[in-house]
Amino acid sequence: MRYFPLLLCLLAITTAEFRNATKQVPVVMWHGMGDCCCNPLSMGSVKKLFEEQIPGVYVHSLQLGSSITKDIEHGFYANTNELVYMACIKIKNDPELKNGYNAIGFSQGAQFLRAVAQRCPNPPMKNLVSVGGQHQGVFGAPYCIGDNIMCNGVRRLIDLGAYLPFVQKRVVQAQYWHDPNQVEEYKKRSIFLADINNENNNNPTYKRNLLSLKNLVLVKFNQDHMVVPKDSSWFGFYKDGDIDTILPMNETDLYKEDRIGLKKLHESGRIHFMDVDGDHLQIPRSVLVNDIIKKYFM
């Protein structure tokens, strides 16, 4: 009988370890421009879909700001580096995420989550799914649906000059504006994209942290009118000084010089390319369930 308490302790430890081992990996989501964390017709619906497909899963849909209104506003007007920092703090302070998480980003939320992976390795991001992201930036002002005051304001400011300091520091889309005809200006003035793509100062921690991913899934929309060029969703982009030529990922300097680890990820079979027929973020439920959730989140 003297061993009975010890056996009970061992049983309790084993049970706890089993529960931790079988617990579903939690999910972090980051929405796109003009959206918010909890819109029942967009992110709220996606969150519900994850919860239906993965019983018991914890889903954290990031809200950047003190309110839904602020969250939407920050999709247009903010310093992206500050948003990424805020996201890192939220993720680190969420006890449900302490053992790691899978992530899915929609539109600009995709490259923002990549920045989280590169800058904030604790807790660890396991898989990153990018849905219509702009990883090499855009060279085309965002398409505005209807009379959207914030979106139309962004277009006017970018037309004024994306690399002007007061525009660059305040307009989110300007911070991943990539002008192939002003490459040096882009490298010098871009406060976000040029940094996370290691265009100037080679930050080895960015590469090391991104290489810790198990999978990087890149989803491109074949009729995308929002992401220009749409190949940016696959890390492709215009050739410097030539907007008539689009280079695929493996022909870009970002890949060939392996600045952030793309080449190594690719050669190790951890980058997965998906293309979807449709316009920006028009992903069928069946594709989201069968080709993304069941493959990379379960």
Swiss-Prot record:
The active site is at S107 (nucleophile), D224, H280. One of its GO terms (cellular component) is lysosome. SUPFAM superfamilies: alpha/beta-Hydrolases. The keyword Hydrolase applies. Its EC number is 3.1.2.22. Residues 1-16 form the signal peptide. This is Palmitoyl-protein thioesterase 1. The gene is ppt-1. Removes thioester-linked fatty acyl groups such as palmitate (hexadecanoate) from modified cysteine residues in proteins or peptides. InterPro entries: AB_hydrolase_fold, Palm_thioest. Keywords: Disulfide bond, Glycoprotein, Hydrolase, Signal. It catalyses: S-hexadecanoyl-L-cysteinyl-[protein] + H2O = L-cysteinyl-[protein] + hexadecanoate + H(+). Disulfide bonds join C37-C38, C88-C120, C144-C151. Glycans are attached at N20, N250. GO terms for molecular function: long-chain fatty acyl-CoA hydrolase activity; palmitoyl-(protein) hydrolase activity. Disruption phenotype: Worms exhibit a developmental delay and mild reproductive defects. They have abnormal mitochondria in muscle and neuronal cells.
